[in-house]
């Protein structure tokens, strides 16, 4: 990563805290934070902060977040929505329109899979991280095809590790 892993997590926590006292109060104590990147290791280092910010937002909506412990579901949903925005901004910073479109596609497809009760959000995340900025997500919306693309781009072992960590977070 361009920044250290600790800096990545600090950046997410500090920005959220500065934005809202509600977000600051939802932060876990430093010693209880789980600083484990899930999908960012599959992609380019320059995307790590944006990916993990968006993924933390996703975990607030659908799983077990690493940095935050909101007091209720409404706060979790609002904080998750908030984190999507700076994550997208961080990805847009390198002037990569395709990368921002990929993130929007990721969020939309994962929400659709969740709403339909269909498995495969981990595969979508893996492909989206591994292929960020390449624009291929528009070509397929099938989790199996996306997972195969992720494995080809990032390697079988790296994708397996990410999917395993994801399953622990979202069940």
Where do the protein language model's features map onto the residues?
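All-alpha prenyltransferase/terpene-synthase fold signal
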Residues: 1-171
